[in-house]
Amino acid sequence: MPRYKLLIEYDGTPFCGWQYQDNGPSVQGALEDAVAALAGTHVRVHGAGRTDAGVHALGQVAHIDLEKSYRTDQVRDALNAHLRPHPIGVLSAEIVPETFESRFSAVKRHYIYRISNRRANLALDLHRAWRIARTLDVAAMHEAAQVLVGRHDFTTFRDTECQAKSPEKTLDQLDVTREGDAVSIVTSARSFLHSQVRSMVGSLVWVGHGRWTIADMRNALAARDRTACGPVAPPEGLYLVRVDY
């Protein structure tokens, strides 16, 4: 039974998230329907990251096990055909060893959060970025972000319904940069807690507006208390960029 690794991009706007749910369409559900159309039977699609409702992906990775062997280009093209009109694209398919697990074999996940720091309404970036009209102090945001880099207890920055056994994570990167009106927050780690990235972004925006100092960020992290967190950034600016193996 060959195992295929899929590289996937999607617009998360119309979906209730990656994971299959009863209350609305999911990316996983759409992919499983497409795989079933190819294979003639239900096949579970295992993803590397369980993105929330409205979150996008440029490089989500999944794996599937098929009873029949297909050429990798056949798998890619068939899935793309059956996925229409969903805003999901299968960029590539490759055969991998049975020991490969899209979620558990991953060694690092990379995300970017996009902010459009302008007064004008969003047109082309509608549902693709968080528009913030008030000018952000990106230098202060980047300095505050470095407080969070390293191994910490991120209880403050995780959802109260997060099911991870431990709140400790090692954050490898958290950089804030600006190019014109575009503010980018780039982060990477082996894994993240539920809502961790958006919670960090929302708190960094408070720093960018002068509502928080760098000391406030340090105190929030040390509090290990969800109520000490700043606002949670909306999902539309977040993208899963790449998963490393």
UniProtKB/Swiss-Prot annotation:
GO terms for biological process: tRNA pseudouridine synthesis. It is an enzyme of class 5 (isomerase). Substrate binds at Y111. CDD domains: PseudoU_synth_EcTruA. It catalyses: uridine(38/39/40) in tRNA = pseudouridine(38/39/40) in tRNA. Transmembrane segments: none annotated. Keywords: Isomerase, tRNA processing. Coiled coil: none annotated. InterPro entries: PsdUridine_synth_cat_dom_sf, PsdUridine_synth_TruA, PsdUridine_synth_TruA_a/b_dom, PsdUridine_synth_TruA_C, TruA/RsuA/RluB/E/F_N. It holds the Pfam family PseudoU_synth_1. GO terms for molecular function: RNA binding; tRNA pseudouridine(38-40) synthase activity. Its EC number is 5.4.99.12. It comes from the Bacteria. The active site is at D52. HAMAP family: TruA. Belongs to the tRNA pseudouridine synthase TruA family. Formation of pseudouridine at positions 38, 39 and 40 in the anticodon stem and loop of transfer RNAs. PANTHER family: PSEUDOURIDYLATE SYNTHASE, TRNA PSEUDOURIDINE SYNTHASE-LIKE 1. Homodimer. This is tRNA pseudouridine synthase A. It comes from Afipia carboxidovorans (strain ATCC 49405 / DSM 1227 / KCTC 32145 / OM5) (Oligotropha carboxidovorans). The gene is truA.
